[in-house]
Amino acid sequence: MLLIIQNGYITPYIYRYLDEDYEIIKSFNVDVTTMDLDKYSVVIILGGYQSVVDINKYSYLLKVIELIKKCLTVKKPLFGICLGFQLIAYALGCEIKSSGKLNVGYDTTILGYDNVFRCHIDYIIPNDSVEVLEYFDNMPYLYKHDNHVYGIQCHPDIAPECIKKYSNHIESYDYAAANKDSINKTNAIIIKYILNLLRDSIKKD
């Protein structure tokens, strides 16, 4: 079973792309440090509106970081998306900075695809704990730590039919409406690809 940590208030849509049972826990309602990690194959840390630059404003995100560190200690496979990508990097000692602008759109190029939604302001400054696998717009967009942690800055978890709940970017609305089938296909492929890498890491251990 997958453990999904929901950090934002919008209902997650990642379930559309999963091939395994899952449990969604809202970090702002539950002390996530109490979760029994032995029940789960992979822990997924989702995005949210918050900024890691101002992490001390969000006491529940400090609990998420504690959970991440616990996962790192026991080598529980971790998958971070957007804010989750930044939270894991922060837990690994990376610096998080603001780009000073909203980076938004569907023209993100990653893993050979060019139709993945992105919507973020902050970005990570990598250290030796993470291996950056891909950059986009001169910012890290995909990294790994050992073989049991992967993070992605963009949003293969957001279904195109739901994009208006996440952004008021008109060009993204129009692109999502015209290309929803191909976007959903890409999202599913990327999510499955990363989850399979993490599952393989369990077998190797």
UniProtKB/Swiss-Prot annotation:
It comes from Acanthamoeba polyphaga mimivirus. The keyword Ribosomal protein does not apply. Pfam families: GATase. This is Putative glutamine amidotransferase-like protein L716. Residues 1-176 form the Glutamine amidotransferase type-1 domain. It comes from the Viruses. The active site is at C82, H155, D157. GO terms for molecular function: transferase activity. The lineage of its organism: Viruses, Varidnaviria, Bamfordvirae, Nucleocytoviricota, Megaviricetes. The keyword Transferase applies. Transmembrane segments: none annotated. Keywords: Glutamine amidotransferase, Transferase. InterPro entries: ChyE-like (IPR044992), Class_I_gatase-like (IPR029062), GATASE (IPR017926).
